[in-house]
Structures are given as C-alpha cells and as structure tokens.
C-alpha cells in the first residue's frame, strides 16, 4: 500500500490496517514454516507495509498531540 493511501486514512482506520497487516504477516510466516509459501518476497513486502503504516500512525498521533 502506498503512503499517500495511508495518509488519507484516519487514526482508527490506520490502527485496523496495522492489525490486518500483522495477521497477514503471521499467516505468511506460518506458510513459510510449513513449506507452503511460494513467493517469499511477500514476507518482505508485508513487513515493509507494516512499518509504513506504523510510521504514518505515529506521525498522525504526534501531530494530534501538538
């Protein structure tokens, strides 16, 4: 997901997005552990999406606190 798409969301939607991404990442890790994951690059992409969403969430929370 692009940063511009994430910036358009509010804090509650971003928190839900992070939860969804963490669940997806967990599922991918389990598939990798059981040798069912064909595209291992999806792990990296999901991890980066999580980091991107958490960064924008922190920016929004910090901006709201000021």
Curated annotation (Swiss-Prot):
Disulfide bonds: none annotated. GO terms for biological process: translation. SUPFAM superfamilies: Ribosomal protein L29 (L29p) (SSF46561). Pfam families: Ribosomal_L29 (PF00831). HAMAP family: Ribosomal_uL29 (MF_00374). Belongs to the universal ribosomal protein uL29 family. This is Large ribosomal subunit protein uL29. It comes from Methylibium petroleiphilum (strain ATCC BAA-1232 / LMG 22953 / PM1).
